[in-house]
Amino acid sequence: MTNLRKTHPLMKIVNHSFIDLPAPSNISAWWNFGSLLGVCLMIQILTGLFLAMHYTSDTLTAFSSVAHICRDVNYGWLIRNLHANGASMFFMCLFLHVGRGIYYGSYLYKETWNIGVILLLTLMATAFVGYVLPWGQMSFWGATVITNLLSAIPYIGTTLAEWIWGSFAVDKATLTQFFAFHFILPFIITALVIVHLLFLHETGSNNPSGINPDSDKIPFHPYYTIKDALGLMFLLLTLLTLALFSPDSLGDPDNFSPANPLNTSPHIKPEWYFLFAYAILQSIPSQLGGVLALLASILIPLIIPFLHTANQRSMMFRPISQTLLWILTANLITLTWIGGQPVEQPFIIIGQLASILYFMLILVLMPLAGLFENYMLKPKW
């Protein structure tokens, strides 16, 4: 009798993607994050669905509907905490996933990489519109500041901003639109994830050494299903610890106050996962220049494949490039810290220096390091 998973049209797709998939025998725990991101997406869609059943996207009732979810709905507090902290876990896994891609040269699978960057942008858009929904002080002022950036675009800026607002300022129409976007975007993300996997399975996974692994492959199940299960346990443990013991530690206290257009928050800032880009935006005095720098900082992964100069794919045996990548990591942490600080000295100058270093590292220093490492590898006799 033929095995059903190998003959059934639907089961066959699942089988080729998750069971009999040939995977390199040497991929490390850094390759866990793809499956963890899939789990995060499922958690967000499920918790979001239950929250949407009780949420009302109206400026008069949005804030109280979130309070109602936490007070009156069975386990509503848990669903909300899982959803809010699930977003933080999602971005943490995403940054590690992208970092692994840069370290091991996975960006040379250009189609997979480009879809990944589009996924990153879509996810950032989803998180931004989602942050506006509770209609607290920081939600309102965050939406006002970020959407106002569109007005810096010459000629069409003001029209574009008013189109996004659905009014002449952030108001009821904005909230309704953002709720609609926040509901539909995760399903678009799911479709993009399928395309991401489709392109990945065309080439097969990269591996730490960066060399062709075709001569030594093992089936994904049971080896990597077990390995991924360990990462999954760590993810769920961290998420539940956050959601149950310290659910508001990553949020902003201002969001416990209902939105008030007449009272501006002293320091408007987005969620922690956007702070690095926000710091780059703030470091440039010109509004248009800041918007362009913000866009460049997020879109820069698109050109990383074209800046690869090294003969070796992975950074595993390239100590200079490794050092530069860790400096970039420290730089991003510095930018995240600066993004959460008030716009005053010494934070302004630190932010400006960190912003310059961010672009210098990616555009100049890392490609030069690759060329230097090529030279060092050449026999000198």
Curated annotation (Swiss-Prot):
Q: Which Pfam families match?
A: Cytochrom_B_C, Cytochrome_B
Q: Look up the record and name the cofactor or cofactors this protein needs.
A: heme b
Q: Gene3D superfamilies this protein is in?
A: Cytochrome Bc1 Complex, Chain C
Looking at the record's lineage, which domain of life comes first? Eukaryota
Sequence intervals crossing the membrane: 33-53, 77-98, 113-133, 178-198, 226-246, 288-308, 320-340, 347-367
List this protein's GO terms for biological process: mitochondrial electron transport, ubiquinol to cytochrome c
Q: What is its main location?
A: mitochondrion
What InterPro entries does this protein's entry cite? Cyt_b/b6_C, Cyt_b/b6_C_sf, Cyt_b/b6_N, Cytb/b6-like_sf, Cytochrome_b, Cytochrome_b_C_euk/bac, Cytochrome_b_N_euk/bac, Di-haem_cyt_TM
- Positions with a binding annotation for heme b b566: H97, H196
Look up the further comments and give them: Heme 1 (or BL or b562) is low-potential and absorbs at about 562 nm, and heme 2 (or BH or b566) is high-potential and absorbs at about 566 nm.
Q: Which family does it belong to?
A: Belongs to the cytochrome b family.
Protein name, please?
Cytochrome b
